[in-house]
């Protein structure tokens, strides 16, 4: 028997005996309240009885007569009235029943057994004449709740037997033609509206024989909740309204199969093709196609991105003029005679024999041997330049110039005086050495350099080996035509040297034109000067200063953002030391008798257990620094909290690292002594903020001695012990590099140096037929033995274009060497590359300088990575530089205002 608002109907024949289940009746107070309502509804039920339609043929009662109700019937009528009112309250506040048919309700109450339905179905809307108080039974598609069962027991009376569960009406009865199946919630709402209409009207119109067509009740559509969510929502009042919500997806299917005929405004349905979930977001655009240089666009896209980012960040963090009091003075530069300069000069006066083979150009096998401090003319097609420094190269850096200045480019370097000299790191040592400054001319992107690389001047030092040198990133260069009152000279840059005696020396370099104009006509060529440094930076303090406690200074890093006042150094004992260069504190700054300064650090901490091999600042924020030591650890530091590193990674023995401007991580070169098999080479390591895994940039068989990155190109270059110089274009490291496909397409060789033996004298050797497949040369442990029986062969790659790169001979040779490289470590590695540096200047951003054990320094232009976009940026920078240039005039002293300089002050 179903409970539906105003009454109950027993359909068909009933079993004589039903099962009885005792259910607790409602409280006395609640029944007394319902008695009052029952008296109020007696008049309404009388009107309903008068408006009942006549029965259809075949549905009459067998007696065909109406008997007056007895006292027992009246008692049942009162109970039915009470149950009618209770059903109104319970149905409007009933919770959603469980979705399982024939099981327990949401509250866990068991379904009572009811009487069987009649074999002949009834038409909805018609009344049974045998029961004058019967009401139309609305259809039901869900289970009854516990409240329905309670009302059912109350209406039947505790003394009456229960009827079995009625059979389910057929589908055609539950789903009228032209309508979708209605759920129980819609039926309850419809029944409630019918009761309101009965109270307002005295009679109801006779329903049609085909069945009633109930008006649609519009309700906001919500997604169907799960069974667990619906059970939890019974205690929440808002969750009980789920019975009035239709399932969106099920409604869409039913509406497509049987659309409503009597509804003029159908409910809006979401299109099925609309994606949902995370996949509905905007997809990342793909870079398809090929760039003009022959590389895919997805490889070149990070290069173009880095160009704009570097330009914007340099405008924010770089300066036009800093350290105005440190101007070169002519009388501090003492020109040495030939006899005085001899101890500082490298011992080798001639370079080893070498030859150059360029891809795509037939060579005649020319063998070169050049003098010390000499160079060969740039190749007219490939623009590569070579010169000889006289000894193994261990320190190298470009002189920064402002963007758009179109000025001459300079590199400073240090070569060891002896080819066979070794330097123990555990002990301090000093001795003569020569700091060299080379001029490369105006390196343009459109034309071959017109001038040879030339030795400008040298600085004689007595601090031993120079392990590292760094120029001030910006604000130290001024125009060479700036006129100054004697003895002041226009400044080229500020240079810091990390020496093997534990000191850091700071020099103010003048422009070569102004300095060479001060020397007499019969002066020695090349010019070697003995210079008094601006400042000497030491560890310790004023009262306790012992450089031997920290050992040799192995690495330097200049603060990359303006005002560039801090300089960091890494020492052999694991200390990282910081100096404040313009400090006036008497505890950190002492003026010596010769006019120079001695500076002491303002901060230092123990960063590693062993020697600090390299350090780098974050170029976007000077609060962060990274260091790598001989303890195989890479540590990221926040200088505001130096007591603990931000991130510490122990992987391998790092030789050098590079922190590119756009990315939150460093590219690391490694020694192969601790590397896992197949994993030696170049790695990109995230700083820890993004949590990405290490990205294997390029595999190498031997130790990678040097690594350099170009902020303008988003590219790193590395030179190793086997004499191969390669470049790798990094992907966009702002996203996870684990998804990068085909990393082999992102790297390419620049040149490969091989040590080739010859049988007889160099004049009888056929160099044109010699190749890198020559058998391994005999073991030679000294430089003299090596050059007597070997020569160097440089095999250059055509860098003007990268079309068909994967099938070209240099690329195949590089890939073969990555898997089957032959290293001979028991001889002098004359072909090894020790230092590599990309140009940091916009005017020469595609140029790369490298050198190594042989003392030969080579310059290459990676023309294929340049683009018309970069050329437009260069033109804009030149226009801005010319707008800021002012006519120069003599200045009165070192403390002049920047407004009197050739550049306008910083914005």
UniProtKB/Swiss-Prot annotation:
SUPFAM superfamilies: WD40 repeat-like. Residues 62-79, 162-171 have a biased composition (Basic and acidic residues). Residues 25-186, 203-289, 758-780 are annotated as: Disordered. The modification Phosphoserine is found at residues 62, 130, 163, 219, 256, 593, 867, 888, 897. Residues 148-158, 211-221 have a biased composition (Low complexity). The keyword Nucleus applies. Residues 80-95 have a biased composition (Polar residues). The modification Phosphothreonine is found at residue 891. InterPro entries: GTF3C_component, WD40/YVTN_repeat-like_dom_sf, WD40_repeat_CS, WD40_repeat_dom_sf, WD40_rpt. Its main location: nucleus. The keyword Cell wall biogenesis/degradation does not apply. Residues 98-114 have a biased composition (Basic residues). WD repeats lie at residues 461-517, 548-589, 607-647, 828-870. GO terms for molecular function: DNA binding; RNA polymerase III general transcription initiation factor activity. It holds the Pfam family WD40. Keywords: Nucleus, Phosphoprotein, Repeat, Transcription, WD repeat. It is found in: Nucleus. Part of the TFIIIC subcomplex TFIIIC2, consisting of six subunits, GTF3C1, GTF3C2, GTF3C3, GTF3C4, GTF3C5 and GTF3C6. Required for RNA polymerase III-mediated transcription. Component of TFIIIC that initiates transcription complex assembly on tRNA and is required for transcription of 5S rRNA and other stable nuclear and cytoplasmic RNAs. May play a direct role in stabilizing interactions of TFIIIC2 with TFIIIC1. This is General transcription factor 3C polypeptide 2. The lineage of its organism: Eukaryota, Metazoa, Chordata, Craniata, Vertebrata.
């Amino acid at each position: 028997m179903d409970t539906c608002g105003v009454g109950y109907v027993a359909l068909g024949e009933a079993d004589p005996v039903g099962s009885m289940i005792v259910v607790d009746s409602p409280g006395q107070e609640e029944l007394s309240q319902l008695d009052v309502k029952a008296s109020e509804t007696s008049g309404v039920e009388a009107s309903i009885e008068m408006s009942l339609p006549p029965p259809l043929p075949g549905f009459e009662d067998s007696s065909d007569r109406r008997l007056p109700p007895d006292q027992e019937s009246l008692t049942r009528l009162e109970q039915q009235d009470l149950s009618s009112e209770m059903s109104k309250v319970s149905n409007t506040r009933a919770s959603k029943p469980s979705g399982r048919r024939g099981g327990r309700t949401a509250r866990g109450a068991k379904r009572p057994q009811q009487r069987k339905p009649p074999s002949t179905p009834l038409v909805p809307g018609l009344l049974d004449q045998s029961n004058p108080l019967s009401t139309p039974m609305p259809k039901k598609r869900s289970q009854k709740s516990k409240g329905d069962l309670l009302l059912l027991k109350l209406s039947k009376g505790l003394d009456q037997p229960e009827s079995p569960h009625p059979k389910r009406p057929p589908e055609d009865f539950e789903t009228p033609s032209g309508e979708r199946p209605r759920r129980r919630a819609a039926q309850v709402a419809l029944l409630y509206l019918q009761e309101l209409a009965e109270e307002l009207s005295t009679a109801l119109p006779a329903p049609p024989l085909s069945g009633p067509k109930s008006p649609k009740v519009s309700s906001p559509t919500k997604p169907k909740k799960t069974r667990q969510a619906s059970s939890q929502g019974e205690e929440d009042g808002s969750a009980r309204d789920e019975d009035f919500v239709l399932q969106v997806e099920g409604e869409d299917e039913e509406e497509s199969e049987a659309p409503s005929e009597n509804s003029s405004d159908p409910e809006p349905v979401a299109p099925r093709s609309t994606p949902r979930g995370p996949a509905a977001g905007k997809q990342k655009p793909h870079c398809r196609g090929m760039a003009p240089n022959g590389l895919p666009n997805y490889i070149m896209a990070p290069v173009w991105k880095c160009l704009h980012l570097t330009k914007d960040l340099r405008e924010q963090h770089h300066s036009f003029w800093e350290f105005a009091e440190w101007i070169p003075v002519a009388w501090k530069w003492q020109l040495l005679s030939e006899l005085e300069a001899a101890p500082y000069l490298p011992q080798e006066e001639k370079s080893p024999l070498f030859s150059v083979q360029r891809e795509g150009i037939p060579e005649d096998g020319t063998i070169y041997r050049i003098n010390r401090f000499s160079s060969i003319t740039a190749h007219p097609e490939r623009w590569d330049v070579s010169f000889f420094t006289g000894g193994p190269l261990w320190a190298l850096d470009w002189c920064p110039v402002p963007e758009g200045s179109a000025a001459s480019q300079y590199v400073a370097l240090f070569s060891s005086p002896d080819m066979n000299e070794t330097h123990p790191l555990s002990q301090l040592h000093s001795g003569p050495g020569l700091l060299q400054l080379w001029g490369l001319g105006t390196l343009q992107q459109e034309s071959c350099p017109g001038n040879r690389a030339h030795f400008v001047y040298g600085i004689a030092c007595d601090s031993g080996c120079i392990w590292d040198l760094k120029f001030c990133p910006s604000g130290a260069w001024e125009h060479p035509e700036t006129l100054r009152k004697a003895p002041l000279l226009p400044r080229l840059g500020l240079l810091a040297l990390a020496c093997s005696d534990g000191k850091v020396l700071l020099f103010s370099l003048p422009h070569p034109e102004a300095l060479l104009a001060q020397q007499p006509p019969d002066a020695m060529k090349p010019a070697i000067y003995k210079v008094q440094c601006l400042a000497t930076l030491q560890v310790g303090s004023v009262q306790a200063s012992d450089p031997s406690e920290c050992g040799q200074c192995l690495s330097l890093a200049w603060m990359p953002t303006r005002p560039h006042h801090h300089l960091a150094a890494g020492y052999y004992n694991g200390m990282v030391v910081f100096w404040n260069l313009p400090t006036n504190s008497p505890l950190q700054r002492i003026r010596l008798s010769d006019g120079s300064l001695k500076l002491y650090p303002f901060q230092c901490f123990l960063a590693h257990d062993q020697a600090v091999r390299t350090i780098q600042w974050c170029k976007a924020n000077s609060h962060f620094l990274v260091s790598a030591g001989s303890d195989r650890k890479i540590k990221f530091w926040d200088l505001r909290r130096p007591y603990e590193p931000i991130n510490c990674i122990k992987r391998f023995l790092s030789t050098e690292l590079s922190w590119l401007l756009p990315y939150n991580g460093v590219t690391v070169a490694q020694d192969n002594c601790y590397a896992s098999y197949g994993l030696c080479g170049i790695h990109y390591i995230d700083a820890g903020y993004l949590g990405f895994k290490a990205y294997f940039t390029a595999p190498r068989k031997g130790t990678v001695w040097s690594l350099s990155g170009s902020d303008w190109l988003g590219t790193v270059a590395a030179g190793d012990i086997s004499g191969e110089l390669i470049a790798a274009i990094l992907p966009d490291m702002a996203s996870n590099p684990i998804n990068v496909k085909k990393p082999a397409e992102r790297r390419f060789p620049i040149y490969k140096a091989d040590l080739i033996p010859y049988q007889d004298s160099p004049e009888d050797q056929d160099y044109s037929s010699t190749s890198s497949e020559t058998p391994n040369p005999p073991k030679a442990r000294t430089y003299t033995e090596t050059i007597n029986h070997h020569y160097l062969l440089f095999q250059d790659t055509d860098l003007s274009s990268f079309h068909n790169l994967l099938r070209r001979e240099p690329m195949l040779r590089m890939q073969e060497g990555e898997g089957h490289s032959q290293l001979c470590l028991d001889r002098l590695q004359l072909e090894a590359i020790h230092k590599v540096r990309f140009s940091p200047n916009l005017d020469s951003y595609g140029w790369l300088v490298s050198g190594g054990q042989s003392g030969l320094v080579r310059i290459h232009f990676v023309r294929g990575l340049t683009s018309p976009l970069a050329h437009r940026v260069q033109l804009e920078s030149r226009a801005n530089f010319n707008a800021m240039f002012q006519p120069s005039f003599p200045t009165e002293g070192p403390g002049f205002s920047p407004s009197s300089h050739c550049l306008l002050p910083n914005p």
